UniProtKB/Swiss-Prot annotation:
The keyword Protease does not apply. One of its GO terms (molecular function) is carboxyl- or carbamoyltransferase activity. It is found in: Cytoplasm. It holds the Pfam family Carboxyl_trans. Acetyl-CoA carboxylase is a heterohexamer composed of biotin carboxyl carrier protein (AccB), biotin carboxylase (AccC) and two subunits each of ACCase subunit alpha (AccA) and ACCase subunit beta (AccD). This is Acetyl-coenzyme A carboxylase carboxyl transferase subunit beta. The gene is accD. Pathway: Lipid metabolism; malonyl-CoA biosynthesis; malonyl-CoA from acetyl-CoA: step 1/1. Keywords: ATP-binding, Cytoplasm, Fatty acid biosynthesis, Fatty acid metabolism, Lipid biosynthesis, Lipid metabolism, Nucleotide-binding, Transferase. GO terms for cellular component: acetate CoA-transferase complex. Component of the acetyl coenzyme A carboxylase (ACC) complex. Biotin carboxylase (BC) catalyzes the carboxylation of biotin on its carrier protein (BCCP) and then the CO(2) group is transferred by the transcarboxylase to acetyl-CoA to form malonyl-CoA.
Length: 304
């Protein structure tokens, strides 16, 4: 009896018992409820196959997907004061930083790289939304400024991929200072005669929208991205009016002239290369031949 109890029964229980399944093994589409295996989602650039819904894409995955062959030079993360205000809400700010670093394996929300996109050299700056909501603080602001300086030194364009809830409240006025600082960096790039492209991703809101996210020479946006300053619910409560359907989406902004193009994630590298070749004054026919696309598909502002 002991042999059955101590050996056979545990074996049967282990074979038939419920197995632990990682929580992130299957990912649910927020639009249709479709369940997608995480590896399939990663291979499809974090786009739901059936619905076409664009999920949030990790910063490093975006850089690897963007640059030719996934090869790029990672720009160093500048060091700044960690918690000068000694801020605490329901949790210490230092604890939030520690948890976000463990979750994302990043020092802060900004990841920047230098590489080639279909032969065009550029600096790309990407927000990691999973790091405290992609919020803009001192470290992020300094990283963005260094990226603009790198682009100027390399005499190449800069492409920004914002995904943020806005300024980081745990840093107070020190966070808000990054709005004018990054705006100055944008102006320096433009004074150098170099293009600045913004690819608006979901979500782009708050102070990030009020600064460098809306200062591009060309604004692209991913489908269905939420783009705005204040949230839709806050605006409705303030105005006491119901807002139009699709308000603050990339498609709505395209219709009202705030966005130049809505581009699917799979088409972004080719579109960026085509736009940049034109802005860098490369012959139009050469740009058309290399991209294999019709330059006439660009908006009038981009062709001017």
């Amino acid at each position: 009896m002991n042999w059955i109890t101590n050996y056979v029964r545990p074996k049967i229980n282990s074979m038939l018992g419920r197995r632990e399944v990682p929580e992130n093994l299957w990912i649910k589409c927020p639009e249709t409820g479709e369940m997608v295996f995480h590896r399939d989602l990663e291979e499809n650039k974090w786009v739901i196959p059936q619905s076409g819904h664009h999920m949030k894409m990790p910063a490093r995955a975006r850089l690897k997907d963007l640059f030719d062959g996934g090869i790029y030079e990672t720009l160093p993360q500048p060091k700044v004061a960690q918690d000068p205000l000694k801020f605490r809400d329901s949790k210490k700010y230092l604890d939030r930083l520690r948890d976000s670093r463990a979750k994302t394996e990043l020092e802060d929300t900004i990841v920047a790289g230098l590489g080639l996109v279909q032969g065009v050299k550029l600096v790309a700056v990407v927000h990691e939304f999973n790091f405290i909501g992609g919020s803009l603080g001192m470290a992020a602001g300094e990283a963005i400024i260094r990226a603009f300086e790198k682009a100027i030194a390399e005499k190449c364009p800069l492409v920004m991929f914002p995904a943020s809830g806005g300024a980081r409240m745990q840093e107070g006025i020190l966070s808000l200072m990054q709005l004018p600082r990054t705006t100055v960096a944008v102006n320096l790039l433009k004074e150098a005669g170099l293009p600045y492209i913004v690819v608006l991703t979901n979500p782009t809101t708050g102070g990030v929208t009020a600064s460098y996210a809306m200062l591009g020479d060309i604004h692209l946006a991913e489908p269905g991205a939420e783009i705005g300053f204040a949230g839709k619910r806050v605006i409705e409560q303030t105005l006491r009016e119901k807002l139009p359907d699709g308000f603050q989406t990339s498609e709505y902004l395209l219709e009202h002239g705030m966005v130049d193009m809505v581009v699917k994630r799979h088409d972004l590298p080719a579109t960026l290369a085509r736009v940049l070749k034109i802005l860098m004054k490369k012959p139009v026919e050469a740009a058309r031949r290399e991209s294999g696309s019709q330059v006439s598909a660009l908006p009038v502002a981009a062709r001017a």
